[in-house]
Amino acid sequence: MLISLPKVCGIYRYNVSMSKMTWLNVGGQADVLFKPRDIEDLMCLIKDAELPISVIGATSNIIIRDSGIRGITVKLGKEFAYIKCKDNSSIVAGGAALLSNLAYFAGEQQISGLEFLAGIPGTVGGGIEMNAGAYGSDIASVVKFIRAVNLEDGNLYEFSSEEMGYFYRGHSLKGRWIFIEAEFKGVSSEYELILQRLKEVIDKKNKSQPVRGKTAGCIFKNPIGCKAWKLIDESGCRGLDNGVAKISKKHCNFLLNYNNATALDLENLGNRVKDAVKDKFNIELEWEIRVLGR
């Protein structure tokens, strides 16, 4: 690489195949994959880097294009996957902690209100970025404070949930961020009741979603006043198949890679669905799956 990389304590890996990391099993190579040792290491990288920086989490809601990711791709590792109690109704979690682990940890601590997270296969950082939600609840309703590093200046900031300016599947912060820690609020409850709610969340997910397939969660956000899956279904796209990827018959807002599809195959199929909904309803669906790369 012609441009030198900042001296850091974390780990650089070069020309990393992203198809082995993503839930959809697609994507080209990342030029450089970096896992920081700690917050200071991350800040140092951002302040000194001469290459563009991208951020990935669990890659459970992402299509990485076949040409891969140029520059430096940051992925928080186990050093940021901690979950700990602050008091009897609050939990602090690192950006790399899985949302499902957070839900079950809360249950073990007899803290209720986070059960819906058990069905979301992403990280705390990714969930904060997209205001992840399920079954009528979302991150905005349970997060208190968030710590984030700005990807432009490399400085550390703290925000309240109100300062984030959350809305459906997004937030209002200007600029680009990597979310490294958050404090979540709940209410004290009995363990058996929480366990039952966790079971209900997982049962509902298993019954309504293609959990055994290669997928990346919901393809599109719900437009105001309607459900994306219903628009897709009524546009004749349930089960739409291009030979390597298809729209799930079980839940038609899910895209499946079932026969070694490429990222382009998946993206093209999603855009066919967008076009069909636009033609029938004059509604422009917005991708919920994040598309990354050239």
Swiss-Prot record:
GO terms for cellular component: cytosol. Keywords: Cell cycle, Cell division, Cell shape, Cell wall biogenesis/degradation, Cytoplasm, FAD, Flavoprotein, NADP, Oxidoreductase, Peptidoglycan synthesis. The keyword Lyase does not apply. Cell wall formation. Its cofactor is FAD. The lineage of its organism: Bacteria, Pseudomonadati, Pseudomonadota, Alphaproteobacteria, Rickettsiales. It comes from Wolbachia pipientis subsp. Culex pipiens (strain wPip). It comes from the Bacteria. The gene is murB. NCBIfam families: murB (TIGR00179), PRK13905.1 (NF010480). Pathway: Cell wall biogenesis; peptidoglycan biosynthesis. GO terms for molecular function: FAD binding; UDP-N-acetylmuramate dehydrogenase activity. Transmembrane segments: none annotated. Its EC number is 1.3.1.98. It catalyses: UDP-N-acetyl-alpha-D-muramate + NADP(+) = UDP-N-acetyl-3-O-(1-carboxyvinyl)-alpha-D-glucosamine + NADPH + H(+). This is UDP-N-acetylenolpyruvoylglucosamine reductase.
